[in-house]
Swiss-Prot record:
Protein name: UPF0297 protein SPD_0180
InterPro entries linked: IreB
Pfam family of the protein (one): IreB
Annotated family: Belongs to the UPF0297 family.
Coiled-coil residues: none
C-alpha cells in the first residue's frame, strides 16, 4: 500500500474520549504508585506498543490496551490544544 497525496480524514468515536481520558488518569496513578515516571512510561507505550511499559498493577495494562494507540494520541493532542485555548 503506497502513500497518497490526498489528505486522509481520521475520526475517533466521540464516546471513547471520556473513557480514554479516565483510563490515562488511572494508568498515570498506577505508574506513580509503583514509583515509575508516568509520563516516560506512557510515552514509551504509545511509541512502541509494548505493554511492558505499563504494569499490571491495578489492571493498568489491561485498561490502556482497550484502546488503539492512535486513539490515545488523538485524545492527548485534543487535550493539549484545548489547554492552549484552541477552540475545537
Amino acid at each position: 500500500m503506497g502513500f497518497t497525496e490526498e489528505t486522509v480524514r481520521f475520526k475517533l468515536d466521540d464516546s471513547n474520549k471520556k473513557e480514554i481520558s479516565e483510563t490515562l488518569t488511572d494508568v498515570y496513578a498506577s505508574l506513580n504508585d509503583k514509583g515509575y515516571n508516568p509520563i516516560n512510561q506512557i510515552v514509551g507505550y504509545v511509541l512502541s506498543g509494548d505493554p511492558a511499559y505499563v504494569p499490571r498493577y491495578n489492571n493498568a495494562r489491561n485498561q490502556i490496551r482497550k484502546y488503539e494507540r492512535d486513539e490515545i494520541v488523538e485524545e492527548l493532542v485534543r487535550y493539549y490544544l484545548k489547554g492552549q485555548g484552541v477552540d475545537l
